Amino acid sequence: MKNVKVIKKAAIFLMVFVLAFSSLSVAAAVTYSRGGKRVRYTGSSYKVYYNSKRVNSVTRPGLMVNGNIMIPYSYTMVKRGPKVSYSKRNKGKVLTLSYNGNKIVLYLNKTYAYINGKKEKIRTAPFKAKVGRTGLIMVPAKVVCEALGINYTYNAARKAIYMTGKAITTNA
């Protein structure tokens, strides 16, 4: 009877251990293109919250690149966050995000954007990333939030960003 309890505890520990480290390896397996070369991301992954609710996951992490936190726009801004409207042109190389009367047009691998019609320089260009088999378009979180009028706060100690605002429902 005692052996059965020990085996059960060991099995539970092993399952928790495997699950914990398998999710860490997914976060660590992020790659993206930089200057025409494939780069493996080795930095920390960042959590993204919208109105106190986490809107990203281990398979859709926020990344620190060139001093900017880059987030997967579709998952964190469109599907689960503030419900930003979007459109893609030119095979996804031009991305337009709209929210509450504001608009930002981003260009893949370009360090400029049009914010409400005005061309602005941005420090880190949007880029395509892969986490496992999942393809993501990463955008600079602070630039996008500020352009769209979404409150943005960064907490370095918690490796998290917090967005606050009113979710907009669309009749699609």
Task: Describe these PLM feature segments.
Residues 2-14:
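Bacterial N-terminal signal peptides that target proteins for export
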Residues 15-23:
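Hydrophobic core
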Residues 4-7, 23-172:
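Primary recognition of N-terminal secretory signal peptides and signal-anchoring hydrophobic helices
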